[in-house]
Amino acid sequence: MSTKHSKAAAEFLKNKKQAAWHDETLWLVRAKRDRLSKEVPEWEELRNMACATKLYSNSHLDELLVEFENNARANGAHVYWAKDADEYCNIVYNILNQHGVKHFIKSKSMLAEECELNPFLESKGIEVVESDLGERILQLMHLKPSHIVLPAIHIKREQVGELFEREMGTEKGNFDPTYLTHAARKNLRQKFIHAEVAMTGANFAVASTGEIVVCTNEGNADMGTSQPKLQIAAFGMEKIVPDRESLGVFTRLLARSATGQPITTYTVSYTHLTLPTNSL
């Protein structure tokens, strides 16, 4: 069966050099993952514990989701439920509309991507700015992410340099990754400062405490939520874990499995709220 993804993949693979480079890059990440996992003697035990927790959570969603909602509300959050993409997009829009929001910054959210939140909000006159560097690159290129963790892994630095020259006025022909990263940081800082609302996804939602946990390497989620008075956290019900003990198992596995790191640079828990906040 032909799908949008398979058609896009077939088109991408026509460029043999790019396909080979992409394959090599992904295998480098996989090699890091394999190497780092072997540094943990109890790696397989942790995986089995995580699997058992997921099986438990998925078979007790009715209880865990209600527990999460009650605890999140007790923490001061507002909780909304959406049955499908249309309802989800409209809930977010209604929250933004109620607050008169026209500028909106977000970190990575698979739910928002799957539900096509960005084009929906843009059609309503709301500016959406992606703060994850890979997602921002793709947003400026009007492309979709190609990987759940490394969204712009198929884009070469020369392409990024040419893009930033057009969009941010960087030096022509300067493709140094550090230089380009600093240019993106400077450009995004103004977006952070003037954003009226920040959205994050969630790597985990803890039922027993009502907290959400967001893991990033760039700190963009933290930067986003530190400025605006309104924060929206959007995630699917599969993110639920029963308690902090379970959370500890997953945080030990997450970065090693995803990017071959011992831990993500930033692991932030949002529990008790100090500003007027909506949580979705």
Per-region residue spans from a language model:
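N-terminal leader/transition segments
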Residues: M1-K124, D132
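Conserved alpha/beta enzyme-core scaffold
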Residues: T25, E87, I91, H99, ...
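Electropositive phosphate-/nucleotide-binding environments in soluble metabolic enzymes
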Residues: L55-D62, V66, A82-D86, H154, ...
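Flexible, glycine/charged-enriched surface loops at secondary-structure junctions
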Residues: H78-A82, S257-S269
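Glycine-rich anion/phosphate-binding loop at the beta-strand->alpha-helix junction
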Residues: V206-N217, A221-D222, P242, S246, ...
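Internal alpha/beta scaffold segment
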Residues: P228-Q261
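Conserved small/polar residues in nucleotide/adenosyl-binding loops
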Residues: T271-T277
